């Protein structure tokens, strides 16, 4: 994702927002939050989505009604970026972040009620309300069985959340190291097709350096 090449109208002073983001990064990461030149477009786009800046979103072809699928190589900072976006003083920060490995682990212990928990809401809540989630590291989860029955847990959850998105506008976010082709191989063409409707696609370059080092 690239920064706009021409001057555009903005609803916020993004220089101030980025300064705040850097301070927030230092506070919560314990080190400087560095924004490489080739990643500024992603940061700018993410900020525009979370701030609901319609002017910037229009220029960058971002659909504010969709969630975000953030892809890129291992260690490029996808999870960290979503965690920092969750600190922005905006009503859009209200999402829960859960790793796909954790979800599959819960499924293997508790079974099919976990599919409901992460899609339509807990079966044991009289006021079931779907929540906004960021499913972290899609593709890292292992194949799963419950009492001998195979289940592609994340595919089932995401397909149900697609229906909820169409019905109620409930947002889902994802981070992943997978390519589009790998997503189709693991989760099927049906889900990949629906992902285009559910998500704005933000991607780090393959050359993005590992920020964990």
Regions found by a protein language model. Name each.
Residues 84:
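Active-site signature of alpha/beta-hydrolase-fold catalytic machinery across serine-
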Residues 67:
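Walker A (P-loop) ATP-phosphate-binding motif of ABC ATPase nucleotide-binding domains
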Residues 1-63, 202, 209-213:
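A short, basic N-terminal segment
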Residues 87-133:
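AAA+/P-loop NTPase substrate/partner-engagement loops
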Residues 136-138:
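Walker B catalytic acidic pair
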Residues 75-81:
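Conserved glycine(s) of the Walker
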Residues 70:
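Hydrophobic anchor at the beta1->P-loop junction of P-loop NTPases
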């Amino acid at each position: 994702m690239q920064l706009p090449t021409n001057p555009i109208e903005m609803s916020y002073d993004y220089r101030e927002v980025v300064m705040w983001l850097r301070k927030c990064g230092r506070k919560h990461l314990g080190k400087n939050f560095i924004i490489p030149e080739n990643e500024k477009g992603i940061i700018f786009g993410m900020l525009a989505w979370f701030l609901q800046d319609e002017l910037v979103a229009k220029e960058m072809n971002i659909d504010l009604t969709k969630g975000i699928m953030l892809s890129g190589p291992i260690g490029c900072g996808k999870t960290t970026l979503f965690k920092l976006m969750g600190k922005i003083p905006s009503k859009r920060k209200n999402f829960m972040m859960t790793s796909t490995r954790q979800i599959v682990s819960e499924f293997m212990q508790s079974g099919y009620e976990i599919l409901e928990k992460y899609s339509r809401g807990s079966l044991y809540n009289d006021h079931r309300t779907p929540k906004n989630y960021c499913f972290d590291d899609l593709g890292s989860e292992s194949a799963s069985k419950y009492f001998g029955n195979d289940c592609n847990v994340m595919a089932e959850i995401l397909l149900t959340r697609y229906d909820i998105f169409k019905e109620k506008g409930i947002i889902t976010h994802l981070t992943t190291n997978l390519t589009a082709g790998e997503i189709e191989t693991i989760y099927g063409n049906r889900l990949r097709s629906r992902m285009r409707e559910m998500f704005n696609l933000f991607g780090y370059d393959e050359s993005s350096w590992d920020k964990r080092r």
